[in-house]
């Protein structure tokens, strides 16, 4: 069976891993997934990540917990293959009144809603993380 939405699969693996208190989760690697994971690490939502394998690359995401609770409270897919959600620079969403982040795919790459607003860019809203 082919995977219809690899990003949603990645977010679900992270969500399920944290609800089961796993140390890490593994998933197939792609440039988009790598960019999103890199952004999650930079924003402090995951501890670290590793790329594994030779011909079939996999990403191992090391999950982050604080006092026994997962750092990621919610991680939700917004734009999906069947319904793409695009926002202009003036209409970029804020997550939990600025406490969370929205991950945006812009013409200059994957970035948070704050950085896109600062650069004056709009784009596709990939997901919300809080």
Swiss-Prot record:
The keyword Transmembrane helix does not apply. One of its GO terms (biological process) is translation. GO terms for molecular function: rRNA binding; structural constituent of ribosome. Gene3D superfamilies: 3.30.1370.30, 3.30.1490.10. Signal peptide: none annotated. One of its GO terms (cellular component) is ribonucleoprotein complex. Keywords: Ribonucleoprotein, Ribosomal protein, RNA-binding, rRNA-binding. PANTHER family: 40S RIBOSOMAL PROTEIN S15A. One of the primary rRNA binding proteins, it binds directly to 16S rRNA central domain where it helps coordinate assembly of the platform of the 30S subunit. Belongs to the universal ribosomal protein uS8 family. Part of the 30S ribosomal subunit. Contacts proteins S5 and S12. This is Small ribosomal subunit protein uS8. It comes from Buchnera aphidicola subsp. Schizaphis graminum (strain Sg).
């Amino acid at each position: 069976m082919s995977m219809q939405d690899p990003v949603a699969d990645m977010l679900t693996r992270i969500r399920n891993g944290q609800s089961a208190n796993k140390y890490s989760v593994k998933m197939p690697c792609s440039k988009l997934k790598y960019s999103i994971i890199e952004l999650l690490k930079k924003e402090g939502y995951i501890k670290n990540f590793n790329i594994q394998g030779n011909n079939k690359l996999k990403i191992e995401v090391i999950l982050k917990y604080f006092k026994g609770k997962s750092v990621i409270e919610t991680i939700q897919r917004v734009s999906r293959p069947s319904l793409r959600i695009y926002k202009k620079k003036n209409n970029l969403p804020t997550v939990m009144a600025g406490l969370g982040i929205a991950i945006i795919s812009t013409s200059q790459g994957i970035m948070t809603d704050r950085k896109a607003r600062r650069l004056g860019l709009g784009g596709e809203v990939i997901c919300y993380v809080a």
